[in-house]
A protein has these predicted regions:
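Short acidic/glycine-rich loops and adjacent helix/strand connectors
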Residues: 1-168
Length: 168
């Protein structure tokens, strides 16, 4: 959708979402009025859902509090980056990824995360409206960095695969 109002005659495209008709990530090429999808990642594997899980865990409302998590990121330290990489998400060199669903309940439960997630990050989710701690700031910084790294890998792979200079 970002391609059509763009000034480009041709461009690669990348779409990321929590879940949109089961596709969470797709990329491909757009020329004129034709789109060709080259790769898709499907639910439950989703960077948006990963980010929403951390939004929930930090005590914010899913689908409306993600901006708060992003706003906390600059105040944190990246002390959970390795934990996220080692346990929650497997990112390939091409930027494709899979979440370890052993830590998440959003696919079938009423919570975004589960007790195993709580154990990984030293306790239960922050209760909404309770004071923020350094833990939430560090979680925000860590998931922000992991998300950005994954998207940059995707972008590099898309550029290498398509040779296109423009990305929508």
């Amino acid at each position: 959708a970002a391609f059509y109002p763009s000034p480009f005659e041709s461009a690669a495209f990348l779409t990321l979402d929590g879940v949109g008709e089961w596709t969470t990530t797709s990329w491909g090429e757009a020329v004129g009025n034709h789109l060709r999808i080259r790769q898709e990642i499907r639910f439950p594997h989703s960077l948006g859902m990963l980010y929403s899980a951390f939004t929930y865990y930090a005590g914010f409302k899913v689908n409306s509090g993600e901006y708060k998590l992003m706003g906390l990121a600059p105040y944190g330290e990246p002390r959970f980056v390795d934990t996220i990489r080692d346990h929650l998400i497997d990112v390939k060199d091409d930027g494709s990824f899979r979440l370890n669903m052993d830590y998440f309940d959003y696919a079938a439960g009423l919570r975004m995360t589960n007790a195993k997630f709580d154990e990984l990050f030293d306790g239960p989710p922050r209760k909404p409206e309770s004071p923020l701690t350094q833990r939430e700031m560090d979680l925000a910084r860590s998931v922000q960095l992991v998300t950005e790294e994954c998207i940059l890998k995707l972008g590099r792979h898309i550029h290498a695969s398509t040779g296109m200079e423009n990305l929508c």
